[in-house]
Amino acid sequence: MTNMTLEERITRLEDIEAIKQLKFRYSHICDDGHNPAHIASVFAEDGIWESEAFGVAKGHAEIEELFRGFESMFSFSQHNMMNPIIEVNGNTATGIWYIMG
């Protein structure tokens, strides 16, 4: 990271913050009834939702279908996200969080 220009470093920080905000938006939607269409809207068209407990959903249609089941499965949820590790590499990024919910 020391070889980056100031502009590149600022862009990286802005990208990381945008990813955090997206994750927080997702959490708020989950905690407001797991609305399938709203959940899918925070993903790219070819986005992937993955969980050890619930499997993998690829794309908006599969994500919406998965979350339709969650609407009746969960009467309450509270997503508390912490300890993000976000790796930015050009136009792509990966992130992991701890969740207490």
Could you describe each region identified by the protein language model?
Residues 35-101:
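A solvent-exposed, acidic/Ser-Thr-rich amphipathic alpha-helical stretch
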Residues 1-36, 41, 45:
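Short, low-complexity N-terminal intrinsically disordered segments enriched in polar/charged residues
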